[in-house]
Amino acid sequence: MAQTQLPHDAKAGPTKPEVRAVVRSKLALTDDDHFVEVGSCTGAVTIAAARDAGRVTALERKADRLETTRKNLAANGLADAVELRNAEAPAELPADADALFIGGSRNYDAVLDHAAETGVDRIVMNVSRLEVAGAATQAFRDRDILTEVVQFQVSHGYELAGATSFDSENPVYMLVGSASGDTEADR
């Protein structure tokens, strides 16, 4: 698997590599899939998806962040692999997405409405704030699209006085859903 290069930064920062690995696993993208990301920021998730999915669309409302995505795609040899849209979701969301990643909490209710209406098969939303995690979980449930809630935290080891200690990242709440089949209520 190719390493993702992110030489261009955005103030919000990229989705961490370990978190991207779990996102990739939950999305299970194939060559036949149309993947859509809402809130591409640095393009870290978009880059990973462009290596797996047959078609990729990334939306970003901030022009400077979209340019960061564009530059990072180019740095990874994927400049022509992604359709970039400078838009605030749900505007300009395609109606034929197979998989959707929501990287931010802005307008997620409207984005989830769109996903439910268009039958998106795989939906993943990452949340870092507890209050938003609770509200977003309820939003998934209200639309009967929740399949799983995962909370995890990554810690990296560092040397301390000749031994190994750990520095923890903020926890991530990952909501996984589907508007086309098996949901939490079905299990």
Swiss-Prot record:
UniProt cross-references to Gene3D superfamilies, sorted A to Z: Vaccinia Virus protein VP39
Domain of life: Archaea
Record-level Gene Ontology MF annotations: cobalt-precorrin-6B C5-methyltransferase activity; protein methyltransferase activity
Binding site for S-adenosyl-L-methionine: T15, G39, S40, C41, T42, G43, E60, A89
GO aspect biological process, one term: methylation
Keyword Cell division set for record: no
Keyword flag Metal-binding: no
Catalytic activity: Co-precorrin-6B + S-adenosyl-L-methionine = Co-precorrin-7 + S-adenosyl-L-homocysteine + CO2
Entry keywords, A to Z: Cobalamin biosynthesis, Methyltransferase, S-adenosyl-L-methionine, Transferase
Similarity comment text for this entry: Belongs to the methyltransferase superfamily. Archaeal-type CbiT family.
Protein's recorded name: Probable cobalt-precorrin-6B C(15)-methyltransferase (decarboxylating)
